[in-house]
Amino acid sequence: MGKKLGIHAYGNVGRNVARIAKGIGMDIYAYDTYCPKEVMEADGIKPVDSAEELYATCNVVSLHIPATAETKNSINYDLVNRMPKNGLLVNTARKEVINEADLLRLMNDRPDLKYVTDIMPAHHEEFADHFPGRYFSTPKKMGAQTAEANINAGIAAARQIVGFLKDAVSYTHLRAHETRHDL
């Protein structure tokens, strides 16, 4: 296939996207500040040193970053503009990580760029009207709406309640890691 896929955040979802993309012959690159490069390399992934390098290298970038104070609006004009000609940005993370004003301006400046997201952005009408055939969104967030995800969320909640009642322990889940807080 010859296409290069960039995984922006190599957590559980990013790993599964990489696994599927490898199965169709894509070259996989990843950037994640929390995941050791050795983990990515063991999975046959090519780690890169920065988000800028990831976007400059890959034809397709798949976003999996959480919406935090440091990541909100971090996917901006300068970063996405590094993508090669005919780049495709796929956002299955959160809409808050996208600087929509920047992305609108960039898509106007770069008629080769495409954007796909699983949650309708605030500026959906502008994207749809100005960029037909280059933009697609679902009407609501779809990422966690599977039977398996809902079952796993229920099990995790039950374990946290039992842990709190039994041992006065609270757990916070961040990405693929778990942090314990003794109360």
Q: Predicted regions: what is each one?
A:
Residues 119-169:
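Adenosine-phosphate binding glycine-rich loop
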Residues 172-179:
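Conserved small/polar residues in nucleotide/adenosyl-binding loops
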